[in-house]
A protein has these predicted regions:
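C-terminal accessory domains and tails appended to enzymatic cores
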Residues: 2-9, 13-18, 154-167, 181-290
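Histidine-centered active-site/metal-ligand motif
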Residues: 26-28, 135-138, 205
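Hydrophobic/aromatic ligand-binding patch that stacks against planar heteroaromatic rings
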Residues: 42, 144, 148, 201
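Short, conserved loop/turn and helix-capping segments at secondary-structure boundaries
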Residues: 67-71, 139, 192
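Active-site rim/loop-helix segments in enzyme catalytic domains that contact anionic ligands
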Residues: 1-118
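Short, solvent-exposed loop/turn segments at secondary-structure junctions
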Residues: 58-59, 130, 180-182, 194
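Internal alpha/beta domain cores that form substrate/cofactor-binding pockets in large enzymes
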Residues: 51, 78-80, 87-177
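A generic structural signal for short coil/turn motifs at secondary-structure boundaries
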Residues: 61-64, 99-101, 131-134, 184-187
Length: 290
């Protein structure tokens, strides 16, 4: 990793992004909270309106039947979004762990519609080409997001959207998750000021993601006649303390080289067109009167 070209991004005061919209697109309940919970809280604090989109139905996680797991993850997904401050949630319900078999055209088309309908400026999601990605839901989502970001601004793709009042939309920039070791990243985001919201979101990931590990440990110790002062006197305190102490180690390590308490990593893509092209500059310098 070329550390010379890594930019450190910190919270900007005064809500400089007020009026802008971002969409965080993840596959599973716990993806965004772990991989970008701090960034999403930061963007909202800076004035963005955020929308959370989950592509899978999470039927494989939750400890119950497929139907029970789907419902449990759906309910917890809304709580995760509320903990960060998202305005709304969209669940697309593709079959968990089998998204490599779905129609990418279908997923891409739904994402294009949402980007246009919500007037999205910034997208946060997976790196479609990230190394070591084993989960088919992750790379299927990442690829569809990448394609949708490009096609969203093409008026001849899904022209019925335009006729229905949802104009083509150019995505301005993207933050790609650092989801696996050795995936590329060029931006380190200081999430220290937003760590409490990240913790709150992870705590809501109880069907999967370890949000209730603290209360479970507290209950096991109580049966043995023991307690950990760290876990406090109630289940909610136990869950938050457990997340803070044991589930944030990666984010501490990401911040250490930059003297940050907590950080998240991303591969950032700036898709904004330059304000002035070389053609504009050439015309200004060389145009003569007729």
């Amino acid at each position: 990793m070329d550390t010379q070209h890594i930019l450190i991004e910190k919270t900007q005061p005064g809500q400089p992004h007020k009026g802008k919209v971002f969409a965080a697109v993840h596959a599973h309940l716990d993806d965004m909270p772990y991989l970008a919970g701090g960034l999403c809280a930061k963007l909202i604090d800076e004035g963005y309106t955020g929308y959370l989109i989950r592509t899978s139905n999470d039927e494989k996680r939750g400890g119950g039947t497929a139907a029970q797991n789907i419902l449990r993850n759906e309910q917890e997904h809304s709580k995760v979004a509320a903990a960060i401050g998202f305005k709304d949630v969209y669940d697309l319900y593709y079959q968990n762990h089998e998204m490599d078999a779905i129609s990418t055209l279908d997923l891409r088309g739904r994402l294009i519609f949402l980007f246009r309908y919500l007037k999205v400026d910034t997208v946060v999601s997976f790196n479609a080409w990230g190394h070591g990605e084993e989960n088919p839901d992750h790379w299927a989502t990442g690829r569809a997001v990448e394609e949708a970001c490009w096609m969203s601004e093409v008026e001849t793709d899904f022209p019925e959207h335009i006729e229905a009042g949802f104009p083509a939309r150019a995505i301005q920039d993207r933050y790609c998750f650092y989801a696996r070791q050795d995936q590329p990243y060029n931006r380190v985001v200081d999430i220290g000021p937003h760590i409490e919201k990240k913790i709150a979101a992870i705590v809501e990931c109880r069907a999967q993601g370890g949000g209730n590990f603290g209360s479970e440990l507290r209950a096991r110790l109580a049966k043995q006649g023991k307690r950990l002062p760290l876990l406090g006197n109630d289940d909610r305190s136990a869950d938050r303390a457990y997340v803070r102490e044991f589930l944030l180690d990666n984010y501490r390590e990401y911040g250490k080289p930059y003297q940050l308490e907590f950080a998240e990593r991303f591969y950032y893509l700036d898709r904004r067109s330059p304000r002035r092209s070389r053609v504009d500059e050439y015309v200004e310098k060389n145009a003569v009167a007729l």
